[in-house]
Amino acid sequence: MVRWFHRDLSGLDAETLLKGRGVHGSFLARPSRKNQGDFSLSVRVGDQVTHIRIQNSGDFYDLYGGEKFATLTELVEYYTQQQGVLQDRDGTIIHLKYPLNCSDPTSERWYHGHMSGGQAETLLQAKGEPWTFLVRESLSQPGDFVLSVLSDQPKAGPGSPLRVTHIKVMCEGGRYTVGGLETFDSLTDLVEHFKKTGIEEASGAFVYLRQPYYATRVNAADIENRVLELNKKQESEDTAKAGFWEEFESLQKQEVKNLHQRLEGQRPENKGKNRYKNILPFDHSRVILQGRDSNIPGSDYINANYIKNQLLGPDENAKTYIASQGCLEATVNDFWQMAWQENSRVIVMTTREVEKGRNKCVPYWPEVGMQRAYGPYSVTNCGEHDTTEYKLRTLQVSPLDNGDLIREIWHYQYLSWPDHGVPSEPGGVLSFLDQINQRQESLPHAGPIIVHCSAGIGRTGTIIVIDMLMENISTKGLDCDIDIQKTIQMVRAQRSGMVQTEAQYKFIYVAIAQFIETTKKKLEVLQSQKGQESEYGNITYPPAMKNAHAKASRTSSKHKEDVYENLHTKNKREEKVKKQRSADKEKSKGSLKRK
């Protein structure tokens, strides 16, 4: 779950946001302006918005008769996980799928957003350095925050973990305070002040803020600010390392968690099939060649792994990739066997055949207009198209024993990646991926996209991670949470060493920042063309902007509270909830009556 709570939003504002920027299933929560202490859940249902009142009894939160929860967060999480449970009074199912988030209150990396006290304690105690701190959202009081600090005292006696102190940070009238007379304009000002003075507890003991615990999660729409933060040098005089170095080093230290078996690649009969002796596929995710003689050891082996986008749910049709090493003379036939059995129609090659005099990949296709047999398959090069950044080959593949069964395969070779480092700017890579995705989307029954470079981990990992993040943002919206470090960890759990260098790590950030900036501009143009009263459902978005919507900000409103609809949960009695309308909404087109 992410930051779906909007402190200063009226019902009319919520309706405007959800209609103008949301998609079906987008939702947000806000304080009730009718009943102090209660909350409202506003949900986009088709082209309309439903407002659901949430009761805060003082002991629990519920939907006036639904399940009861200790916190607002638990209530929202329950109904997002239990799809189909919420119904409108006319039986229309209400889906909570995509949170419409507020901006982060700060771009500082010590802000972790949505995090429980237990999760904060686990992180800080694992760090083990007294006076390490972070700031997170308050789950018990939405709109407030918590400063979690690792003390220098054990929690329960000698040998036990250090105690974590949680200090509530209240946001009152747009100012921040931990209580007392001191108030601050921003969270950053508050933290900077108490880094200098410490915080005195009621007992008289002091809590100090000495070492921030940095987050890698970021609101996608705020990634440009995060890039600026990561480019800053450390404050200490003995080092000039920037945040990108810190994050990448932290990622490298976590590589020990991915020590999965790689026994197949180590077999003597398979050693000649590996371009580099220590870059081997994990057994649990390796591509197994089908139809091979089981009596021949290693005959089903190829140095390639399936890579699944686990950022999206099973109902969101996330792409699957195959990450492979570049072909050797001994593996070309196996490569075409893999492409055929997986029904892959798009191959992405991110290297030249030779770079700086070194062989990177054996050409596994014939010259233009030529046909060649590779094992049991015939491959014909029907044509090549050169662009500034890449070359596109159209290949036809068929089994030698069935020439009438022909598949067309599009081979995209990126030619502008420098021999060392990364491209100077990401525009070429983003355009390249846009063409690839348009092709893949035009082939509804196509199998995984095959991506390879030379070793199949550096450029290959970089391209796959960028594409995964773009797909995630395009599905969930520009204000969704992304975590580049954790995304790479997820990919590395499927193939070892994906994303090899700090430069590649930073390039992913820069590429996603440019993708978001470009998408924002395209979305603004589309919205201006449709006019302010436009409905998302009437807009045809480009593939890379599917479901994209702009970020909501924490803005106050003078509007009054508006419509609530009677609502019930399945197997619960229908509650009678009186509709509340402001005078200017009496004849609003926002009525939720369904046809």
Swiss-Prot record:
Reactions this protein catalyses: O-phospho-L-tyrosyl-[protein] + H2O = L-tyrosyl-[protein] + phosphate
Gene3D superfamilies the UniProt entry points to: Protein tyrosine phosphatase superfamily, SH2 domain
Post-translational modification: Phosphorylated on tyrosine residues. Binding of KITLG/SCF to KIT increases tyrosine phosphorylation. Phosphorylation at Tyr-564 by LYN enhances phosphatase activity. Phosphorylation at Thr-394 by TAOK3 leads to polyubiquitination and subsequent proteasomal degradation. Ubiquitinated after phosphorylation by TAOK3. Ubiquitinated by a cooperation between ITCH and WWP2 via 'Lys-27'-mediated polyubiquitin chains resulting in the reduction of its association with LCK.
EC number: 3.1.3.48
Domain Tyrosine-protein phosphatase: 244-515
Principal EC category: hydrolase
Record GO biological process: B cell receptor signaling pathway; CD27 signaling pathway; cell differentiation; cytokine-mediated signaling pathway; epididymis development; G protein-coupled receptor signaling pathway; hematopoietic progenitor cell differentiation; MAPK cascade
Region (Disordered): 535-595
Alphabetic keyword roster: Cytoplasm, Hydrolase, Isopeptide bond, Nucleus, Phosphoprotein, Protein phosphatase, Repeat, SH2 domain, Ubl conjugation
MF-aspect GO terms: cell adhesion molecule binding; non-membrane spanning protein tyrosine phosphatase activity; phosphorylation-dependent protein binding; phosphotyrosine residue binding; protein kinase binding; protein tyrosine phosphatase activity; SH2 domain binding; SH3 domain binding
PTM annotation (Phosphoserine): residues: 10, 57
Chain residue numbers at which the record places covalent cross-link Glycyl lysine isopeptide (Lys-Gly) (interchain with G-Cter in ubiquitin): 308
Impact reported for residue 419 to A: No loss in substrate binding but impaired activity
Tissue-specificity statement: Isoform 1 is expressed in hematopoietic cells. Isoform 2 is expressed in non-hematopoietic cells.
Intrachain S-S bonds: none
Domain SH2: 4-100, 110-213
Modified residues (Phosphothreonine): 394
GO cellular component: alpha-beta T cell receptor complex; cell-cell junction; cytoplasm; cytosol; extracellular exosome; extracellular region; membrane; nucleolus
SUPFAM superfamilies (UniProt xref): (Phosphotyrosine protein) phosphatases II, SH2 domain
KW Cytoplasm (keyword) present: yes
Active site: 453 (phosphocysteine intermediate)
Family membership: Belongs to the protein-tyrosine phosphatase family. Non-receptor class 2 subfamily.
Role played: Tyrosine phosphatase enzyme that plays important roles in controlling immune signaling pathways and fundamental physiological processes such as hematopoiesis. Dephosphorylates and negatively regulate several receptor tyrosine kinases (RTKs) such as EGFR, PDGFR and FGFR, thereby modulating their signaling activities.
Subunit description: Monomer. Interacts with MTUS1. Interacts with MILR1 (tyrosine-phosphorylated). Interacts with KIT. Interacts with SIRPA/PTPNS1. Interacts with LILRB1 and LILRB2. Interacts with LILRB4. Interacts with FCRL2 and FCRL4. Interacts with FCRL3 and FCRL6 (tyrosine phosphorylated form). Interacts with CD84. Interacts with CD300LF. Interacts with CDK2. Interacts with KIR2DL1; the interaction is enhanced by ARRB2. Interacts (via SH2 1 domain) with ROS1; the interaction is direct and promotes ROS1 dephosphorylation. Interacts with EGFR; inhibits EGFR-dependent activation of MAPK/ERK.
Name this polypeptide is given: Tyrosine-protein phosphatase non-receptor type 6
Naturally occurring in which organism (per UniProt): Homo sapiens (Human)
Lineage per the UniProt record: Eukaryota, Metazoa, Chordata, Craniata, Vertebrata
